[in-house]
Design a protein with these regions (language model features):
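A residue-level signal for conserved active-site and pocket-lining positions in enzyme catalytic cores
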Residues: 11, 140, 257
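Anionic-ligand-binding alpha/beta catalytic cores of soluble enzymes and soluble regulatory domains
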Residues: 124-208
Length: 282
């Protein structure tokens, strides 16, 4: 099933013509495509972030939607170019470099095919080695979204189990304590989004208004430790105060009401940034 929707994501930014070129290639293949943008502000080369933003988004798009994600520091190398079919019958066109990690874990991938560049590479670009986003991914995505090719015509089938995956931090739950990673930021506002799911946090039996000891480490270095209130939303604490909350993806978040937690405490993201939440009794 194809629905003529094409959603683009990259680390290209919008300061030059790269994204516009991708759009042009897609519309040249099918002028009736409806093209939308997830984001083009992924931190350059940050595959983990690209993977997370797909996970943040795909569930809210209809069945049959085609996504093109280009965060490709290995462009021109031997890494594979693939199309993954999700459990919701959506398609993700991307390099097989870890971009599919969060989709595989949290959404589900039912099949994956390697893009045959003989059939699905834009003509006369075989000597272009640094812009697969235009010549392979946008082009193949447009063909798929428009129904000009089927998923089976993308190329040979690969094993879903062989998809390149990024390492993730497993949540640890102990008595009155839960540990996870700071996966990503709510970028504009500087809130921290952790890997700890709502269900995992609920093992601590929290009630709104409870206080928790929050500890953040970067590798083995202590970065932050303080007592923080758990609330429904930011207004449950005074302006400038920290708050624990469940975010829109049902993960535990840490924010400052009308402030940036990340900037205030110089906190980063990724598997080297870990967070511990301990319930304060009494």
């Amino acid at each position: 099933m194809n629905n003529n929707l094409l959603v683009l994501q990259s680390d290209f930014g919008l300061v030059d013509g790269a994204v516009s070129a991708m759009i042009g290639v897609a519309l040249e293949e099918s002028p009736t495509l409806k093209i939308h943008h997830l984001t083009h502000d992924i931190t350059p080369y940050n595959i983990f972030e690209g993977s997370y933003r797909l996970f943040q988004t795909v569930d809210y798009w209809p069945e049959g939607t085609t996504f093109v994600s280009v965060v490709d520091p290995g462009v021109g190398s031997k890494r594979k170019s693939v199309v993954a079919k999700t459990a919701k019958n959506q398609y993700i066109v991307t390099p097989d470099n870890g971009t599919l990690s969060f989709i595989k874990k949290h959404v589900g991938i039912v099949a994956i095919r390697e893009i045959s560049e003989v059939a699905n590479r834009r003509q006369n670009t075989e000597h272009s080695y640094t812009f697969n986003g235009r010549d392979v991914y946008a082009y193949t995505g447009a063909k798929l979204a428009s129904g000009h090719i089927t998923f089976e015509e993308v190329g040979p089938e690969l094993s879903v189990e062989q998809i390149v995956e990024l390492p993730v931090v497993a949540t640890i739950i102990e008595d009155h304590l839960v540990k996870g990673a700071i996966d990503i930021l709510d970028v504009r506002f500087g809130s921290l989004w952790t890997s700890i799911t709502r269900e995992e946090f609920y093992k601590l039996e929290p009630e709104f208004g409870d206080r928790f000891e929050v500890t953040i480490y970067h590798a083995d270095m202590l970065v932050y430790q303080n007592q923080v209130v758990y609330g429904k939303s930011f207004a449950d604490v005074r302006i400038g105060q920290p708050i624990l909350y469940i975010n829109s993806l049902y993960r535990l978040g840490l924010a400052i009401n009308q402030g940036s937690f990340a900037k205030a405490y110089n906190v980063g993201v990724g598997s080297s940034w870990t967070i511990e939440i301990k319930k304060i009794e009494g």
